[in-house]
Each structure stands twice: as structure tokens, then as C-alpha cells.
Amino acid sequence: MSTIDLLRHGEPRGGVRYRGDGVDDPLSERGWEQMWAAVAQTSDWTHVVTSPLRRCREFAEMLARRLALPLDADPRLREVGFGAWEGRRHEEIREADPEAYLAFFRDAVHHRPPGAEPLDRFYARVREGILAIFDEHPEGHVLLVCHLGVIRAATALALEMPLATFYRMHTPYAGRIRLRRTMRGIELWIGQ
């Protein structure tokens, strides 16, 4: 049985804003504390995989060194791109373009920010990355340091959920879910 623990990065510097694959802030001091606390009780991983973005990669590199584990960075597992909204605060967008902001929250599949990555394309690349981890580590226990969007896509994969429900899920900074590939397919484990 293959297991992947998906760990969302900790709080980044710069506050709450649209931070996709175009804004690469490092972790804040609090973000580092969140990450170390999240992994304090677990060390049975056989491999670490990370998004190449700093808020994931820098912690993954340090943890892999500390645990003497192999590390891979996979660009398929970077955050979804938010186009023109990258780096902007929610309030700023809501005030500047309330119609687009509301349309996005009502139907994020068909009302993407200008220049944003299409949600179906994002899901396809994350799905490919997750399945590759399962294929490359058929008996392994992999830690994947990633983003909220990647966790949403992984949840949608496991539960065969429509992309229209994508933004109804939330995982806090340094929050974690687990996927297992079994005879039944990919299973989602919460609160392991």
C-alpha cells in the first residue's frame, strides 16, 4: 500500500493575499514554527516530495536533510496560478472589481481571474503528479509539502468530486491530509 501525507506550507510572509505560482514568498517565523510542530510526531516517511516554490521547498529541504531522506521537487505540484490577482489582497479585489470577485466565488471554474490558470488544467497536472508519486513509491510513505490548491485537487481526485466544489474545502497552514492507494482506489484519510 502506498501512502502520501500532504502537508500544506506554513504561514508565508506578506499576509493573506492571492499567492499562486506567481508570488513566491518565504515562510514567516510563525510559518516555520507551524511546520516544525506539524511534523514533530511523525518520522516514518520514506521520501519527501515538494512543490518547487520557496514556501514549500525550503522547509522540505531542511526536513529531508534532518531525516536523511531523498527529496524531489515536482513542478506539477506548484500552486494554481491566479493571473492578475497574484499578490493582491482579497479586499483590494473585492473593492476594485466586485462583480468579478463575486463571480469567481460563485463559479471559479468558469470565472477565473484574468490570466489565471484554468482550473481543469491545474487539476490535470496535480493529478498527474499525485499518480506519479503513487507509481514511483508503491510501498512507500511519502511526505508531500505543498499548497492548499494541491490539497484541494488531491481531495477532488480521491473523492471524484466535481471542480465546481473546489473552493468549498479549506486546510489551515501546516494542515495535513493523507491519501492511500489501496485495492479500492485512492482513499482520503483525515485526522490520522
PLM segments and residue spans:
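Short basic (Lys/Arg) and small-residue
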Residues: 147
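Active-site signature of alpha/beta-hydrolase-fold catalytic machinery across serine-
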Residues: 62, 153-157
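Generic structural signal for well-ordered alpha-helical scaffold segments
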Residues: 36-40, 123, 127-135
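Short, active-site-adjacent cap segments at secondary-structure transitions
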Residues: 13, 55-57, 79-81, 150-152
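Phosphate-handling substructures
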Residues: 66-125, 187-190
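Acidic, low-complexity terminal tails and accessory targeting/binding regions
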Residues: 1-3, 38, 80-92, 135, ...
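Active-site-proximal alpha-helix that buttresses catalytic centers in soluble enzyme cores
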Residues: 4-69
